[in-house]
Amino acid sequence: MASNLVEMFNAALNWVTMILESPSARVVLFGVPIRGHFFVEGLLGVVIIILLTRKSYKPPKRPLTEQEIDELCDEWVPEPLIPPITEDMKHEPPVLESAAGPHTTVNGKDVVNFASANYLGLIGHEKLLESCTSALEKYGVGSCGPRGFYGTIDVHLDCETRISKFLGTPDSILYSYGLSTMFSTIPCFCKKGDVIVADEGVHWGIQNGLQLSRSTIVYFKHNDMESLRITLEKIMTKYKRSKNLRRYIVAEAVYQNSGQIAPLDEIVKLKEKYRFRVILDESNSFGVLGRSGRGLAEHHSVPIEKIDVVTAAMGHALATEGGFCTGNARIIDYQRLSSSGYVFSASLPPYLASAAITAIDVIDQNPDMLVKLKQNVALLWKGLSDIKGMSLTSNRESPIVFLKLEKSSGSAKDDLLLLEKMADRALKEDSLLVVSSKRSFLDKCRLPVGIKLYVSAGHSESDLLKASESLKRLASELLLKS
């Protein structure tokens, strides 16, 4: 049977070959001989055109039966709306029942509060409350729109002017939410193809801004200027031929995750040597560092013009809400058109802008608050200097006092559980509210976890001694026995 098929195929092939090679299959058109294979190719072209112009075949539609619908529904397994709850997520933080001042109320009990960044003790300040009340009576609660439409009110412009005057910069811009300031400002200036060199210890808001920028991100070791220099050197070597490459250094003045203070003078020297721009977040230094609270530039005696972009949240030292960015007029004007947090968000409620103006006035008129804050930081450092099982790793002038475990278990999760147990006992046994440096799974910071204490000018000497004694007792009971 197979041999018969082969013979039939060969016979058909010979017949086609004979037809195509016969003299009758050759045509002369305008002096050009047309052979048989041209005929076949033309025929194929016609077939292709017919196939392309035909309507596609659509199988007849048949609605599913009730039984088929039920079977599909039974087989469907929906994805969970949220990720599964892990053991470390079950820890419930304490809930404040009053304002987050130096003392607050938790579970109906008065506690000493070292968990709020109320550095100057302005939460509940009489002048700020009066300012908020008068602004509410004049403007109402909200601004009812973004700044570029109908959300700009005179108090917003007054606040921007007051910030610029306080810091000695040409212009400023307000944001309605402190955290959004950094993750709107960074993508505003940094785009795909740019290079950003960032400290590995920056907080989550900055990390989010770096991700949204879609730039090439390179991290250097936390607060290590030699690591920064080597990183900048490598980038300049790698992109030597890229003439229009935009390059940025991103850092915090006081690092929220460690309490370290950035050496701005050295950063500026490296910036000028390698021709980078600097974006600096002063959320934890504005109103705190420097002789008059003007931040890291004053602290290191560096002209503020050396910093290209300065941002800060106003929810810390100023005891209000929102954030700002300050710098030269071109930097600020560009954000008014291109920064998503400014363009698309409702503007800062007027009463909060009014409170910020009043807070800056209070700082200007009461330099003794800064002196008191520095004294409190020094007193807490002295009290915790001999704590067993933990070590102080923050800067001595930082308002964030950071206690790190001397002996880690090797697992950040286990270390965190131990620190949370310590914080829970401090609250229950000594009415002391402190926090561990808990981070979400989205946070890329890999610095060691620890206990953070936010020092306030409103803390009394007895508050600081109470914190020192409580933590030393708990450290000896929990850490030395484990």
Swiss-Prot record:
Top-level taxon in the UniProt lineage: Eukaryota
Entry-linked SUPFAM superfamilies: PLP-dependent transferases
TM helices/strands, residue ranges: 32-52
Compartments where found: Endoplasmic reticulum membrane
InterPro entries recorded: Aminotransferase_I/II_large (IPR004839), AON_synthase_class-II (IPR050087), PyrdxlP-dep_Trfase (IPR015424), PyrdxlP-dep_Trfase_major (IPR015421), PyrdxlP-dep_Trfase_small (IPR015422)
Principal location class: endoplasmic reticulum
Membrane topology note: Single-pass membrane protein
UniProt entry keywords in alphabetical sequence: Acyltransferase, Apoptosis, Endoplasmic reticulum, Lipid metabolism, Membrane, Pyridoxal phosphate, Sphingolipid metabolism, Transferase, Transmembrane, Transmembrane helix
Tissue: Ubiquitous.
Transmembrane helix listed as a keyword: yes
Mutant lacking the gene: phenotype: Defective Embryo and pollen lethality. RNAi mutants display plant size reduction, altered leaf morphology and increases in relative amounts of saturated sphingolipid long-chain bases.
GO cellular component, one term: endoplasmic reticulum membrane
Cofactor(s) this protein requires: pyridoxal 5'-phosphate
Gene Ontology process terms (BP): embryo development ending in seed dormancy; multidimensional cell growth; regulation of programmed cell death; sphingolipid biosynthetic process
Known catalytic reactions: L-serine + hexadecanoyl-CoA + H(+) = 3-oxosphinganine + CO2 + CoA
Pathway: Lipid metabolism; sphingolipid metabolism
GO molecular function terms attached to this record: pyridoxal phosphate binding; serine C-palmitoyltransferase activity
EC number, UniProt record: 2.3.1.50
Family to which this protein belongs: Belongs to the class-II pyridoxal-phosphate-dependent aminotransferase family.
Entry function: Component of serine palmitoyltransferase (SPT), which catalyzes the committed step in the synthesis of sphingolipids, the condensation of serine with palmitoyl CoA to form the long chain base 3-ketosphinganine. The heterodimer formed with LCB2 constitutes the catalytic core. Involved in the regulation of the programmed cell death (PCD) signaling pathway. Plays an important role during male gametogenesis and embryogenesis.
Additional free-text comment from the UniProt record: The fbr11-1 mutant is incapable of initiating programmed cell death (PCD) after induction by fumonisin B1 (FB1), a specific inhibitor of ceramide synthase.
The protein's assembly and partners: Heterodimer with LCB2 (LCB2a or LCB2b). Component of the serine palmitoyltransferase (SPT) complex, composed of LCB1 and LCB2 (LCB2a or LCB2b).
Protein name as catalogued: Long chain base biosynthesis protein 1
Record organism: Arabidopsis thaliana
Lineage: Eukaryota, Viridiplantae, Streptophyta, Embryophyta, Tracheophyta
